[in-house]
Regions:
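Bacterial Sec-dependent N-terminal signal peptides
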Residues: 1-26
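Short loop/turn motifs that connect adjacent beta-strands in outer-membrane beta-barrel proteins
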Residues: 30-40, 68-76, 102-107, 154, ...
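Gram-negative/organellar outer-membrane beta-barrel architecture
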Residues: 35-43, 49-189, 271, 283-286, ...
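Structural signature of outer-membrane beta-barrel channels/translocons
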Residues: 49, 65-67, 98-102, 148-150, ...
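Transmembrane beta-strand segments of outer-membrane beta-barrel domains in Gram-negative
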Residues: 111-113, 118-250, 320, 324-332, ...
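Solvent-exposed, glycine/polar-rich loop segments of beta-barrel outer-membrane systems
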Residues: 177-181, 265-277, 333-345
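Outer-membrane beta-barrel "beta-signal"
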Residues: 194-195, 293, 346-348, 375-387
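C-terminal outer-membrane beta-barrel translocator/porin domains of Gram-negative envelope proteins
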Residues: 204-318
């Protein structure tokens, strides 16, 4: 697949209280549950992209941050909308909500997604080749709902629901897809019902400087609500250590597993995205299990340079980042150190909402170099941290 090059057309920071002179520096030393002024913010990020299979892609990433009450210790809530359309009549809409309420005792998340977008399918396992890619048209409907309640201290318990329907059709006859025997090759549907346990004592959920977050979700897809009876396990750990007033080291590990007698290829855990194993095309490697870990160093930077342009008045603050990771996809009978692949890169963050510690993130990452291919890499422009 031709690499998509994203170009930021413009940055519009339209937020209440964005004026830097009115904000306290809450980033360098913030204890758990830091009290900060509650301010709403809205950040739209228009982007343009081009690739031969999509043509010209026009879209935006918009994030609205707000608080559900005046409780000074309440975490901020967010609504994130990402719409995009292409000149090849393709469309995607992704809406995510992350709501905190009742003194952080209740936490609700949702994801509504529809896309009619092409993807590259490379095959199964961790030895796929770029030359074996087949371009597929993928139409997806997705509804994901999660609710968690504090049961004591820093512990939460909750329930989750995921419905997803996929349709696939090969756009070309080359590559590995036409001749592969795959479960639900043309698509299917699944409904996962799950239970979640969480430990969370982070000082802030957006740009964390100290604390730990551990999440385990076990979900079951019953046969009468899904095409196949399946089990899914998702576990993740995040731990942050402040090593100076301006610098932090974060550790992140995850494990995803899909179990059942017949496993649809499009539900298999995939390596690579803007959150973990940056530098790899999502789905370049996929298999029954996925295990990965990463370390990221962040250094807070305040150049103390005021900017006054028309109605924008700010004193921008940044963070520099360096990260490294290793991960592997594997089946139940075949895990070895040789499966693990590298990922490393550099990035910069801009705090567009200092009170809530919301950032715009730019990362460039490199992955492995397979024989006869260029080294895998990726450029990422995102709203929010990788972890």
């Amino acid at each position: 697949m031709q690499r998509i090059i994203f170009f930021t057309a413009t940055l519009l920071a339209l937020s209440q209280g964005l004026t830097a002179q009115q904000q306290k520096d809450t980033l360098q030393s913030a204890p758990a549950d830091t009290i900060v002024p509650h301010k709403r913010s809205f950040f739209p990020l228009p982007v343009l992209g081009y690739s031969p299979e999509k043509g010209l892609e026009i879209g935006a990433a918009m994030l609205y941050s707000f608080y559900t009450s005046k409780d000074p210790l309440l975490r901020n809530s967010t609504i994130n909308l990402i719409p995009a359309i292409t000149t090849e009549h393709q469309l995607k809409i992704d809406l995510k909500t992350d709501i905190w309420t009742d003194a952080n005792n209740w936490h609700f998340k949702s994801n509504l997604r529809y896309h009619d977008f092409p993807i590259n399918f490379y095959g199964l396992g961790d030895t796929t080749r770029k030359a074996g890619a087949t371009l597929l048209d993928n139409k997806r409907y997705k509804v994901q709902l999660e609710a968690e309640h504090r049961i004591g201290g820093h512990f939460y318990a909750g329930l989750s629901l995921l419905f997803q329907q996929d349709d696939y059709k090969a756009r070309e006859s080359k590559g590995v897809y036409p001749d592969m025997s795959l479960v639900d090759k043309d698509g299917g549907h699944v409904t996962f019902i799950g239970a979640t346990g969480i430990f969370d004592n982070r000082d802030n959920q957006n740009y964390t400087r100290s604390g730990t977050w551990v999440r385990l979700n076990i979900s079951y897809a019953p046969g009468f609500l899904s095409k196949h009876e399946l089990w899914k396990i998702d576990g993740q750990l995040r731990h942050f250590i402040p090593i100076s007033p301006k610098s932090t080291v974060g550790f992140n590990g995850l494990f995803n597993s899909l179990q059942g007698s017949r496993l649809p290829f499009y539900l298999l855990p995939e390596m690579g995205n803007d959150l973990m194993m940056r530098g790899y095309y999502t789905g370049r490697y996929r298999d029954q299990n996925y295990l990965a870990g990463q370390v990221e160093y962040r250094y807070f930077l305040n150049p103390k340079i005021p900017i006054n342009i028309w109605f924008v008045h700010m004193q921008p603050k940044f963070a520099l980042a360096a990260f490294g990771a290793s991960g592997a996809v594997f089946n139940n009978k075949n895990i070895a150190m040789s499966h693990f692949k590298p990922s490393y890169g550099l990035g910069v963050r801009w705090f567009y909402d200092e009170g809530a510690r919301l950032t715009m993130r730019i990362d460039y990452a490199w992955g492995e170099k397979r024989s006869g291919e260029q080294r895998q890499s990726g450029l990422y422009l995102s709203l929010a941290e990788a972890f």
